[in-house]
Amino acid sequence: MSATLYATIEEVLMLHSMLLTRYGGEPGLRDLGMLDAALHRPRSGYYASLSEQAAALLQSLANNHAFVDGNKRVAFAVTGIFLRMNGFALRAATDDAEAFLIDKVIKARASAQQIADWIEAHLRPVR
């Protein structure tokens, strides 16, 4: 099995800028330490599966509020890219994914395991 690939801070900052350009929002990084912590959480060795690592990444990026604006967009985009980098993709309707992110991850503060279960249910190998 090949080593798991992870996004860098530089890549996430570039993606954040691209998302703000496309969808609007206030630019700015609020807390580099929170961004760094979110990106390193999946690498901690605590999360056995790719779904669990993706869940930790999504949860941390969405809830740490490292950016002034666009945290949820970045969280979902980076998680999707992380999965793609590692040979998988999320297959969920946009409305369903948005509802899960806002209602479960943000508002209900779903556990990392609940998020991992949702990701696992929507995960497909990339061909």
Give the residues covered by each predicted segment:
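FIC/Doc superfamily catalytic core
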Residues: 1-127
